Design a protein with these regions (language model features):
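Extended, compositionally biased flexible segments
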Residues: 1-100
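Catalytic-pocket segment enriched in acidic/His residues
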Residues: 2-22, 37, 43-45, 64, ...
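Interfacial segments of alpha-helical transmembrane regions
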Residues: 101-106
């Protein structure tokens, strides 16, 4: 088969301990999945989960021991950080039951759901989709994927983010409103999951703005952390 132009390269993510990389299919994100974050955004309760997406090429790979540069995006003066656990899907399926979800997980990574909060809020006020606030170039910094078998305690792991050495976000994966397994069950009822899908599982409280020159360092117990410098 020939193409009218050369197709873009497949986006892929490093895997801890392997030379092979993880090819990215889709990026799903869960909104308001920690109680305290839901409250700081003006919501409360265990509402049904809702999802949005980022393009695969929004990935910005942060390699271990290095700080990756992220260009400050256009059209915003209020760029926010959201540190998240990312689930990497290794086996696809639809209508996956929570009890079977672990069979579909390849591994986990640390990710940032970078958000143009001013644009997101403007779209919310107008009752319009807020893709412009979430789905932009470099909006999904992510570290290497650790195979699931190597992090059996991920469901109770600590999660944190520092900006310029100061704590901004600190919580525990156990505080997810919808657990990893429940999220997979709900998500796979709406879309058929495929190998290569990523799920950003939501952010804890403490989201806030970053500026050019800031350095963000995020981590989750058992996973390789990420470091991002805003340019």
């Amino acid at each position: 088969m020939s193409y009218v132009f050369t197709p873009p390269a497949t986006v892929s993510i490093a895997v801890v301990g392997l030379s092979d990389t993880f090819p990215v299919h889709r990026i799903y994100c869960v909104g308001r999945n920690y109680v305290e974050h839901a409250q700081e955004m003006g919501h409360s309760g265990r509402d049904a989960p809702f999802f949005f997406m980022k393009p695969a090429d929004a990935v910005l790979l942060a390699t271990p021991g290095n700080t990756v540069a992220m260009p400050y995006p256009s059209l915003t003066t209020n760029l926010h950080h959201e540190i998240e656990l990312v689930v990497a899907i290794g086996a696809g399926g639809a209508n996956i039951k929570a009890a079977d979800a672990a069979k579909h997980i390849y591994g986990y990574a640390v990710g940032l759901d970078m958000t143009r909060r001013d644009l997101q809020n403007d779209m919310k006020k107008q009752g319009r989709p807020w893709c412009i606030g979430k789905s932009f170039d470099h909006s999904a910094p992510i570290g290497p994927i650790t195979p699931a078998a190597q992090v059996p305690g991920i469901a109770t792991a600590a999660i944190h983010l520092q900006v310029n050495g100061q704590d901004r976000q600190r919580s525990n994966i156990a505080k997810l409103i919808w657990s990893i397994a429940e999220t997979i069950e709900q998500l796979s009822a709406a879309w058929t999951l495929q190998p290569g899908d990523l799920i950003f599982t939501g952010t804890p409280e403490g989201v806030g703005a970053v500026a050019r020159g800031d350095t963000l360092v995020g981590g989750i117990d058992g996973l390789q952390g990420i470091s991002v410098h805003m340019e």
